């Protein structure tokens, strides 16, 4: 099957529409130029590459705690989109339920962006997510997961890890963050996104230096807990990345049965399509 025609679900992308939904002034970074991708434009990208559904992630860059653009895209997209929102740590359980009714399936925690201290008081929120059967989505980098893992394990919240865990490859395979990642894999609480290679590659496209780690992620989590994602439109990217080239790269690294699992079967089951 042609890779571009293969039915797929994109497990991590962003929509930004500063004309209809201006960036809040208090958010320090405002994406511009090719970083901007409206929901309308993204649906054309989806149609061009056979992407049937997508998990939209509220971006800390640009919107921060403002979920209006995200929720509008879900509402206007029929059943094509579900979302991961960004919220305050003290959000009520009822407010989370209200977000659920609008297509939100989880909450994003970006320690790579904010640091660990910013999330010091999230235990009650994680407990709410567990009780509501929602996802806690963590974007970590280097060894940050080492500090988060005991809380995840104690609370028992189901956890989604962005971008293969974003290790520091120079730290080697025994890095504390990687050891925590494999503990999460063994626990059965976690799923992981096969995505964001450029966020931890030291050599750039075609990200050959990440291949060994990506294969370990696939083996460690297994086909039932790995989902593919594009990370479109590549916020804060330092060089150009295109949807099609990322698809062809993934096709080179994985067999057809593996692609079927990560691009359709597993995300459809996990995300409810």
Labelled PLM ranges:
Residues 61-144, 193, 197:
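Active-site gating/metal-coordination segments in enzymes
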Residues 26-77:
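Alpha-helical scaffold segments that flank or form the walls of functional sites
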Residues 12, 46, 70, 99, ...:
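Conserved, mostly hydrophobic/aromatic
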Residues 39-43, 67, 71-74, 93-97, ...:
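Generic structural signal for well-ordered alpha-helices
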Residues 1-9, 32-53, 215-216, 221-227, ...:
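Mid-to-C-terminal alpha-helical segments outside catalytic/metal-binding sites
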Residues 9-13, 54-58, 81-85, 107-109, ...:
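Hydrophobic faces of well-ordered beta-strands that scaffold small-molecule active sites
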Residues 105, 119-227:
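Catalytic pocket-lining loop regions of alpha/beta-barrel enzymes
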């Amino acid at each position: 099957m042609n890779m571009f025609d293969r039915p797929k679900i994109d497990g991590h992308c962003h929509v930004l529409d500063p004309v209809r939904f201006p960036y809040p002034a208090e958010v320090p970074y405002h994406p511009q130029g090719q970083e901007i991708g409206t929901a309308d434009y993204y649906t054309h990208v989806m149609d061009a590459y056979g992407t049937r559904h997508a998990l939209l992630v509220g971006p800390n860059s640009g919107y921060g705690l403002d979920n209006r653009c995200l929720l509008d895209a879900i509402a206007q997209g029929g059943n094509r989109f579900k979302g991961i929102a960004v919220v305050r740590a003290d959000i009520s359980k009822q407010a989370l339920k209200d977000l659920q009714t609008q297509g939100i399936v989880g909450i994003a925690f970006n320690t790579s962006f904010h640091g660990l201290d910013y999330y010091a008081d999230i235990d009650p929120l994680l407990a709410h997510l567990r009780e509501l059967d929602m996802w806690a989505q963590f974007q970590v980098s280097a060894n940050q997961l080492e500090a988060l893992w005991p809380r995840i394990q104690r609370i028992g919240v189901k956890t989604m890890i962005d971008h293969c865990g974003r290790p520091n490859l120079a730290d080697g395979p025994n890095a504390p963050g990687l050891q925590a990642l494999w503990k999460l894999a063994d626990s059965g609480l976690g799923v992981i996104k096969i995505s964001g290679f450029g966020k931890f590659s030291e050599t750039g496209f075609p990200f050959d230096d990440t291949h060994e780690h990506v294969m370990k992620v696939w083996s460690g989590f297994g086909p039932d807990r790995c989902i593919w994602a594009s990370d479109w439109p590549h916020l804060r990217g330092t060089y150009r990345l295109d949807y099609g080239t990322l698809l062809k790269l993934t096709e080179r690294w994985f067999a057809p049965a593996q692609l079927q699992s990560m691009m359709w079967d597993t995300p459809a089951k996990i995300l409810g399509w």
